[in-house]
């Protein structure tokens, strides 16, 4: 049986851009997973993101996901994107990526300033007992982010960078 993208919903998701005092953005390198949307891609750097639970507000999900994936708690909200940003999985990943249940994601993005000490950042393992999603992290120039993400998410990152560019201090 062939799964059609138009028969699947978008997964509601919160995306999180975290800037340090120098205006650089936190990015983590995804752990390679076989048979997933990251399988075989050399562009594995991304900002934290995660699903919004039923009944959960997007900002609450963003704060929860940020802590679950990175351990960061000492952050200040700077901005919220003006609208939801959608992406579709490429046809070859329909029925595989996002556990096969979604055609892509509808993301609500938030920008935060990291105010803590870098010792707060824990990715492997993260502090909540969840499985690690990243095997490395770094502070990246905001304008470099679209080139670091898997190609099918590049347009999302271009929109996020455009939305929050004024926060980088450049």
Swiss-Prot record:
Keywords: Hydrolase. InterPro entries: Nudix_hydrolase, NUDIX_hydrolase-like_dom_sf, NUDIX_hydrolase_CS, NUDIX_hydrolase_dom, RppH. Accelerates the degradation of transcripts by removing pyrophosphate from the 5'-end of triphosphorylated RNA, leading to a more labile monophosphorylated state that can stimulate subsequent ribonuclease cleavage. It comes from Agrobacterium fabrum (strain C58 / ATCC 33970). Residues 9-162 form the Nudix hydrolase domain. Belongs to the Nudix hydrolase family. RppH subfamily. Its cofactor is a divalent metal cation. NCBIfam families: PRK00714.1-5 (NF001938). One of its GO terms (biological process) is nucleoside phosphate metabolic process. A motif (Nudix box) lies at residues 50-71. Its EC number is 3.6.1.-. This is RNA pyrophosphohydrolase. It holds the Pfam family NUDIX. PROSITE patterns: NUDIX (PS51462), NUDIX_BOX (PS00893).
